[in-house]
């Protein structure tokens, strides 16, 4: 039966604290799986999956990203990463969690699991840090043609300039998620 514990670390923003849940196996661990959740999710949604992995010998760890789950209670705002460079802050926090766990268990294989938005975060992470993971699992990811990505970025940038970074934009939300 897996055990779990919680801890926090200081976010790379310098303003927030990031909530972490860790599930541990009863016996000797055979590896570490770091879960990166999707948009509008939190790490505790992965409890059944994490317990399954822990019951099969893995240490499982995952954080609530900036603006998600219990990280909101520590200086965050729901769904909001940062005024600027928000994506980078989340990727830096992912790296910090990796480093915390790798310091504790330097000899264990390290696996990243990213779902939905978490898959894009993990994809960014492995581009920046290809030497750190031993394996990567990408779930529920996607791909858009470059013109659509550039158009979406232009729309988002214009909306931030017009309304500010904290405004929830229904038009942009519908364009981004309407098909889902």
Regions picked out by a protein language model, each given a short descriptive name:
Residues 33, 37-41:
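Active-site glycine-rich loops that stabilize anionic/oxyanionic intermediates
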Residues 82-102:
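Alpha/beta-hydrolase active-site loop
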Residues 124-180:
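Alpha/beta-hydrolase-fold enzymes
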Residues 1-27:
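N-terminal cap/lid segment of alpha/beta-hydrolase-fold proteins
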Residues 114-124:
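Glycine-rich nucleophile elbow surrounding the catalytic serine of serine-hydrolase chemistry
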Residues 48-76:
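Conserved alpha/beta-hydrolase
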């Amino acid at each position: 039966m897996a055990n779990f514990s919680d801890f926090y670390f200081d976010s790379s923003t310098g303003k927030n604290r990031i909530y972490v849940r860790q599930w541990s196996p009863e016996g000797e661990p055979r590896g570490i799986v770091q879960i990166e959740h999707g948009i509008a999710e939190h790490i505790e949604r992965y409890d059944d999956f994490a317990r399954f992995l822990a019951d099969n010998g893995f240490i499982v760890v995952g954080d609530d990203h900036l603006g998600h789950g219990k990280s909101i209670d520590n200086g965050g705002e729901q769904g909001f990463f940062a005024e600027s460079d928000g994506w980078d802050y989340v990727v830096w926090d992912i790296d910090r969690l990796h480093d915390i766990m790798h310091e504790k268990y330097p000899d264990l294989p390290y696996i990243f699991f990213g779902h939905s938005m978490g898959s894009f975060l993990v994809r960014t992470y492995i581009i920046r840090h290809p030497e750190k993971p031993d394996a990567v699992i990408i779930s529920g990811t996607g791909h858009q043609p470059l013109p659509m990505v550039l158009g979406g970025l232009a729309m988002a940038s214009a909306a931030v300039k017009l309304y500010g970074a904290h405004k929830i934009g229904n038009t942009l939300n519908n364009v981004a998620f309407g098909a889902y």
